[in-house]
Amino acid sequence: IYMVKKEWIDKGFVDEPIAKELDLKSEIRELCRKKNAVIMAHYYTEGIIQDLADFVGDSLALAQKAAKTEADIIVMCGVHFMGETNKILCPDKKVLVPDLNATCSLAESCPADEFSRFVSAHPGHTVISYVNTTAATKAVTDVVVTSSNARQIVESFPSCLLYTSDAADE
């Protein structure tokens, strides 16, 4: 049993010292095996995290991998929206985001409450959001797109579209 310290919650991560004799990588791999957990890391994470991960990719590839994993626990080393996306795709799995301070400026640039009001003020439109949005923003959209399929999806609708966040490269 692990005790959660308030300072860890305040910081958003655990930064306790690690004994030098501890083989942390082996300990993590063994814990993942025991707990049936998979570690997924975005390309933006540090190399040491990517080396430990079972799968490394962009947000779309990570979401696709999460949807297919048989693991009970997904450790998503990335930003909030990636963990949220994994939870949406895998509601019966436990999804952990190790660094609660890891945010995406693109996702943060579209507050869900403001976007919801904008959508309400423009009825009759198909609402499209980019994958780099929060779950709350995705909840008021009809279609979620990625940089690889945005053009095809947008062109498939006749007109009257609302689109949030730009399709910046990942």
Label each PLM-derived region with a short phrase.
Residues 4-85, 89, 98-113, 117-128, ...:
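Metallocofactor- and cofactor-centric catalytic cores in central/energy metabolism, strongly enriched
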Residues 93:
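Carbohydrate-active enzymes and regulators
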Residues 145, 149-151:
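Donor nucleotide-activated moiety binding/catalytic core segment of transferases
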Residues 154-162:
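Short, intrinsically disordered, charge-balanced linker/junction segments flanking boundaries
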Residues 163-169:
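Conserved small/polar residues in nucleotide/adenosyl-binding loops
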